[in-house]
Amino acid sequence: APLEPVYPGDNATPEQMAQYAAELRRYINMLTRPRYGKRDRGETLDILEWGSPHAAAPRELSPMDV
């Protein structure tokens, strides 16, 4: 993971604060961006396989569903 930017202090110049704000924004975006990897692959394949013979058969509604 990227390192969190260091706060320049209360006496920092506006340029230093702007630099810190930009680095902090990049850092937060990096931590919160969606990840598309092996774990997501299962969900996307389900959509593609709707018509395949391996798709789960629709089940009857149970009393719990009603």
Curated annotation (Swiss-Prot):
InterPro entries (alphabetical): Pancreatic_hormone-like, Pancreatic_hormone-like_CS
GO cellular component entries: extracellular region
UniProt keyword list: Amidation, Hormone, Secreted
Gene3D superfamilies: 6.10.250.900
Propeptide span(s): 60-66
Family that this chain belongs to: Belongs to the NPY family.
Protein name: Pancreatic polypeptide prohormone
